[in-house]
């Protein structure tokens, strides 16, 4: 089963002959949605930007990253524009090298892509001449009307998935709800020969938002986008699994540490075997890319990866109204404490008063006693 899971769709770098000098290339996909910069930032991350700043020529790399962000946001927000052509490619922005070499700016571009899962139109091809790096898009996304439809579909899908998790009390629960919802919605995409599909949309978020199927990039990018939207810190992870290129996620959970999640493998295996796993478990068959001289294998250093799997039993549950003594149970002990407070026999602490004032009127009286009693009897929540 695992042998059918592919890697990131990235073609090897090659040299072409454009208008001036030579153009280099490589290949894959990203998004376009509503005219809202807030939505873009809500679904994205700046983790890669921060890491690039720690590298040699970090300031120049961050400038290039910012220019790429600006260019992609402009294309997302302007569905009335087309794209230019350079050699055989569709381009929507040229980024000056600004002191960087081709490999360095390629690392910046792929880091930018990994931070922003919505940009389906940002192809994984690396193209540059002597003076500029070009941001390239697949033919499928040249028309503004196509991008407008894609953007609306992305917005609708991300927000609908996020709503399913909004009522959960912990980041672990939210991450699990989104994981399960994605795997209920999607199926792994194969071509007619039963090999992993290489259609552009199977390698970006549109596979989930429009088609209901995709390869590992689709699973990982939509998971990344929804968790970002829910303000759960996470990373798109690239590397190898069972010897083949693969993509998954690292998610920061309630204890402050990051854990790996592989929605793709869990979907194919019909299990939760790769949800909230630590380095010890995941390293048995997953190897994360590292900062490397090859742009196509370059990946930032991930922080705070737990060595062990997450233990959901250690999640501290939020204290409920009526739980006056904070023991996690609402019972006769809480009624006794409130009654003693009302009679002036034992005054509650300021913290405990917050949970004794069940109706939230700023007073602690017989009304609160009645409501706590109703909770105990199962007549109220």
Q: Which residues are covered by each model-predicted region?
A:
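Bacterial N-terminal signal peptides that target proteins for export
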Residues: 1-9
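Sec-dependent signal peptide cleavage junction
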Residues: 5, 16-34, 381
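Cellulosome-associated attachment modules in secreted, modular CAZymes
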Residues: 20-25, 313-381
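N-terminal accessory/pre-domain segments preceding catalytic cores
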Residues: 24-170, 288-319
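Extracytoplasmic/secreted envelope proteins and their assembly/folding machinery
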Residues: 65, 69, 105-109, 151-162, ...
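Sec-exported extracytoplasmic/periplasmic mature domains
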Residues: 117, 159-166, 180-188, 224, ...
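Secondary-structure boundary elements
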Residues: 147-208
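Hydrophobic/aromatic-rich core segments of domains that either
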Residues: 218-283
């Amino acid at each position: 089963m695992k042998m059918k899971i592919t890697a990131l769709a990235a073609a090897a770098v090659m040299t072409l002959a454009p208008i001036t000098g030579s153009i280099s290339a490589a290949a894959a996909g990203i998004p376009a949605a509503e005219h809202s910069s807030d939505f873009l930032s809500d679904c994205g991350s700046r983790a890669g930007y921060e890491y690039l700043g720690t590298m040699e020529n970090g300031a120049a790399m961050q400038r290039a990253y910012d220019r790429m962000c600006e260019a992609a946001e402009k294309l997302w927000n302007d569905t009335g524009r087309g794209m230019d052509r350079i050699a055989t490619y569709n381009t929507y922005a040229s980024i000056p090298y600004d002191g960087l070499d081709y490999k360095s700016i390629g690392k910046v571009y792929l880091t930018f892509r990994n931070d922003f899962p919505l940009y389906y139109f940002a192809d994984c091809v690396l193209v540059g001449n002597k003076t500029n790096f070009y941001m390239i898009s697949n033919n499928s996304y040249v028309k503004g009307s196509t991008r407008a439809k894609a953007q609306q579909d992305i917005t609708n899908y991300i927000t609908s998935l996020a709503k399913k998790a909004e009522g959960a009390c912990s980041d672990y629960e939210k991450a699990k709800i989104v994981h399960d919802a994605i795997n209920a919605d999607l199926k792994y995409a194969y071509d007619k020969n039963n090999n992993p599909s290489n259609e552009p949309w199977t390698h970006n978020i549109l596979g989930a938002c429009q088609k209901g199927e995709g390869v590992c990039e689709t699973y990982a990018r939509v998971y990344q986008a929804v968790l970002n939207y829910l303000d759960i810190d996470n990373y798109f992870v690239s590397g190898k699994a069972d010897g083949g290129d693969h993509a998954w996620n690292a998610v920061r959970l309630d204890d402050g540490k990051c854990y790996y999640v592989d929605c793709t493998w869990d979907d194919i295996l019909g299990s939760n075997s790769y949800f909230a796993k630590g380095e010890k478990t995941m390293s048995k068959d997953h190897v994360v890319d590292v900062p490397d001289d090859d742009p196509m294998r370059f990946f930032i250093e991930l922080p705070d990866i737990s060595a062990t799997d997450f233990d959901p039993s250690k999640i501290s549950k939020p204290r409920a109204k009526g739980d006056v003594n904070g023991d996690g149970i609402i019972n006769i002990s809480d009624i006794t404490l409130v009654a003693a407070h009302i009679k002036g026999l034992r005054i509650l602490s300021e913290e405990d008063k917050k949970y004794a004032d069940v109706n939230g009127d700023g007073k602690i009286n017989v009304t609160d006693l009645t409501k706590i009693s109703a909770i105990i009897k199962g007549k109220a929540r």
